[in-house]
Amino acid sequence: MSVFNKLMRAGEGKILRKLHRIADQVSSIEEDFVNLSDAELRALTDEYKERYADGESLDDLLPEAFATVREAAKRVLGQRHYDVQMMGGVALHLGYVAEMKTGEGKTLVGTLPAYLNALSGKGVHLITVNDYLAERDSELMGRVHKFLGLSVGCIVANMTPAQRREQYGCDITYGTNNEFGFDYLRDNMAWSKDELVQRGHNFAVVDEVDSILVDEARTPLIISGPADQPPSGTADFAKLVTRLTKGEAGNQLKGIEETGDYEVDEKKRTVAIHEAGVAKVEDWLGIDNLYESVNTPLVGYLNNAIKAKELFKKDKDYVVIDGEVMIVDEHTGRILAGRRYNEGMHQAIEAKEGVDIKDENQTLATITLQQNFFRLYDKLSGMTGTAMTEAAEFHQIYKLGVVPIPTNRPMVRADQSDLIYRTEVAKFAAVVDDIAEKHEKGQPILVGTTSVEKSEYLSQQLSKRGVQHEVLNAKQHDREATIVAQAGRKGAVTVATNMAGRGTDIKLGGNPDDLAEAELRQRGLDPVENVEEWAAALPAALETAEQAVKAEFEEVKDLGGLYVLGTERHESRRIDNQLRGRSGRQGDPGESRFYLSLGDDLMRLFKAQMVERVMSMANVPDDVPIENKMVTRAIASAQSQVEQQNFETRKNVLKYDEVLNRQREVIYGERRRVLEGEDLQEQIRHFMDDTIDDYIRQETAEGFAEEWDLDRLWGAFKQLYPVKVTVDELEEAAGDLAGVTAEFIAESVKNDIHEQYEERENTLGSDIMRELEPRWVLSVLDRKWREHLYEMDYLQEGIGLRAMAQKDPLVEYQREGFDMFNAMMEGIKEESVGYLFNLEVQVEQQVEEVPVQDGAERPSLEKEGATAAPQIRAKGLEAPQRPDRLHFSAPTVDGEGGVVEGDFANDEATGDTRSGSADGMTRADAARRRKGGGGRRRKK
């Protein structure tokens, strides 16, 4: 344990004593609530709300509120919160991460802080990893809250904005991390206040907090629209790389020459093309220099094609179903339908597999969900079965302390030491022998594998031995809950990819609810089609199932409980602990063991040679395992290396995103003020003054008044607004040209532009002007922000090369990002003023109001003939349009690795806005280009 971790744990005892004290306080008043009627219990909610409004704090209300929820849960669910669950609830309310072992009832714990914090009326968000858990928890735990008079909502995919607004309006809202994050982004792309769905970020309880805040922290949420051009060279390069051969890196100091056309580093998941490979590619493509700037996109195609060939394996990283490449979550083995890798990687895999290649997308809005979205909450807490291994990270990045909550009953699971074999074949043979032996006596077994491929290989070996079993992987994900629920039955053998079924308890003897449902379905009943018959038959079926489960539970308990067998160590100790944690819930007996081989990914990438030497020295045959402390230490060392590597990556992502986050706060704050109806008159006057100052500064920064090109300056003014004051008038007022100073020009032109603004308002009318101003500002702001994200993307992609010039890439990114942001702000001011004066506006009379479409978003500034708002027509600034496709990119559910994408439902699409100018460049853009900032790069 590191010194930092020891320091972190030093205060644990003090916190636990505090939690114990409060839990005892709740138990001491429990009897006062038992004799209350349902109506009296429900009335307490209003009483607590009044007391909170009168100045009592939530901490003051905590003991009574928790006792109220405990009694309500007893009456509604038949479940009473244990004292340790009370401790967990207090930890969550105080803003800690509560580590609670599997089966300790984390879902029930969430009801306590949710109820207490909902009393403030500001809303509580309970965040889970998938829609299934969000719906299940909101329905089941929602009964307790509804019984106590609180409203409960649930956010799931494909809801309309109106439905989402209603769910967010509830006292307590359940949903997934991605849904909450995307709603925040879409709120900041909204075109009117009516489209906003979220009402603030008060308090969040994150379930499986390690998965959401750690595993997925490297992956940002991205909303994107179609790119201007689809990738054209992907298919050609997929064919081309089949003619290239993999080799090894050279070392000039050791006199080792590089071999092959390219090298692959599996540990870092990178590829590098050798000189020989470059020469071949140049020859085949008929080009002189692959690395010329004009050929930059080709390098990207080539690297992606090699990665697709070497690093992305079919039936492990992805599967091909019905001509479509589908990503497989590396942790759960689930298919992530509709999701796509970004940066052209998915297209490269599609080209490799010979299926249709779909277009790439362009970023419209982005945020790192974990590191910046969750920091929006006034108070954040979380719960998981495995958090202590990442306690330092929770503290350093999120300022969250971790508290290990004691188990309700002592843990009696036996964790056996690892067995290591020389080859994978020998390992799996031993695994099959072990399973067959345990299966013969009837002990339930859960086998964890790391990929679809390995789960199917093991399944074949078990079938050859005649062992009946269930396979749970990406290809059987639709039966997941049923298989997992019955994995604790006598004689059950379940082969699962990693952590599939997280959130579903494996109960010894089986799950009576699922047994009863299966029995009724066998009789031909359906809960949707035969509602009345189902309701009538359910109680009897449930009673029969409960009796059967009770008898089987005792049998399975005597056999030793659930045996968890891991076929490979994961790169994170936490994932291994999660697999082990499936067994030994609530004091049940259980056993776990990991089988390893030198061919396993972790062993191959780290320390395998040392272990091989140990086994060779000991002269160990292939089929004989070793249990060696040195090997166990080597595995622990390899895991900590990977964990540290991943931690550094996450910290690095945060540093870079922090730059963008500050810019995002400025832009989103500005948008929110516009949407909420702030009077823009004063702001637009500032825009005018700043733009005039900028124009004059660019023209008069050098030389004397006689050398200034005032005709060119006035030409720019005329493009901006209908300028009335002339150069001759200024000369006359100043006496001669020498008296015309920059300050004098600025004062005269500002007075003139303000007069023209008032004249424009008199022509159109104040009401119409007030309605058009937010449209002008929002349309320009959105397009400029989108272009800025685009450029920041490319800046970050190439910034690492600055290290070769002895410069800190992060400092360079901050400096250049700041310059780009300032240029964008200047462009926003300039274009907003230009729209104000140059847009043609027609007012149609006898129309009372402008209807706002539900789900309508930003305007299109180019498509004429689009459906116009009935009251005001502004040429080039028409009613909001929806593009055909709008995409999202998010972290994999339950996973750590992939960046994945999919389509939003059309009614949630957000319109695209484009420049109304001929070349799309403002003077601010042009000035930046002259300074060497370059134009906007087009993403290929």
Curated annotation (Swiss-Prot):
Residues 851-940 are annotated as: Disordered. Induction: No mRNA is detectable in stationary phase cells; the protein is subject to protein degradation in stationary phase. The lineage of its organism: Bacteria, Bacillati, Actinomycetota, Actinomycetes, Kitasatosporales. It comes from Streptomyces griseus. This is Protein translocase subunit SecA. Residues 928-940 have a biased composition (Basic residues). Does not complement E.coli temperature-sensitive secA mutants. It is a peripheral membrane protein. Belongs to the SecA family. The gene is secA.
